[in-house]
Amino acid sequence: MVKLLSGLEGSQTSLKLQLYPFDAETTIQTGATGTLDDGGELTLPAQLTYDDGTAYTGAVRVQSHYYNPAEQGFLEAAPGNMSAIGADGNIYTLESYGMYAVELSDASGNALHIPDGATAKLRFPLPANYSSVPQEIPLWSMDEASGKWIEEGVATLQDGFVEAEVAHFSWWNIDVPLNPVTVCMRLVDATGAALSGFPYKISSSDQSIAYAVGWTDADGAFCAQVAATFPSAINIVWNDELILVANIDAFSEDTDLGDILVDMGGFYSLTGKAV
C-alpha cells in the first residue's frame, strides 16, 4: 500500500489505512479472457514472462480487487491521495470512475509480467450510481516511488465496460483530471477551542466526489487539495456519520479560510447512571 501523508509544517497529523485483501482469484489461460473482482474482465496476451524474462504460457493465477469510487471508504483504501501527474507534466487531482489492483502468478506463486511490446485488455465495471460516464476517460497507474498517479493513455466506453490496454500491472485507475488548489482551515468549537484529531472529508458540494480525507492536527488545522473553480463541502465524521460543517465557494488559487466554526452542541452525549 502506498499513501501520501499531508500536513502543516511543524504539526502532528494522523493517517488512516484501510487495507483490503484480493477479493477474487481466478485462473485464466494466456491468450484468454476471465473475470475479475466485481464483474470486471481481463484478457491476457498469448505469452507472459517471469522476472528474469523467461517466457511463460499456460494457466495464470489472477488475483484482483476492485476499488469502487461510490463506496464511503474509497479514499482511505485507495493508494496515494488522488494527486496525479498528467501526460502534459501538470499536477492534477482525480475524479475516479473505478480502480483495480491486479497481480499475476503461476501455480507456484512466481510473479508473471506482460512482456515488452505486449498489452493486456482490462475492462472496468461501471459504478451503478454514476448517471453518466464519458466516452473516453484518461487512464492512470500508481507510481509507488512518488505515491502519485501517472497518466498512461485513455480508456474507452465499450459494451457496458470501460476498456483499457495496459502494459504492466500494479494499480490502474480511470479518472477525469481536475485542476487542484490547496485549501487550508482550522476547525474550532463555539468557544474557539481547536477540534484536534477530528476526521474530516472534503467533497464536491453535492457530496458525489470525495477530494480528500484525513484528521485535523493538534491545532485543529489541515490543508487539502480540492478541484479548482468548483464549490466544495467541508464535513466531519462523527459516530460513522458524515456531518456537513460548511459549504465553501470555488477558488482559483490556494486559499487559507482561517477558523471554521463547528457547532458541537448536537454531537456530544453522555450515558451512564447517576449515583
Model region roles, listed by residue range:
Residues 1-2, 6-37, 49-50, 69-70, ...:
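Proteolytic cleavage junctions
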Residues 2-7, 241-253:
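Edge beta-strands of extracellular beta-sandwich domains
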Residues 39-88:
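Predominantly extracellular/luminal regions of secreted and cell-surface proteins
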Residues 42-44, 56, 92, 112, ...:
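Short, isolated positions in well-ordered beta-strands
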Residues 236-238:
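Conserved structural position at the C-terminal beta-strand
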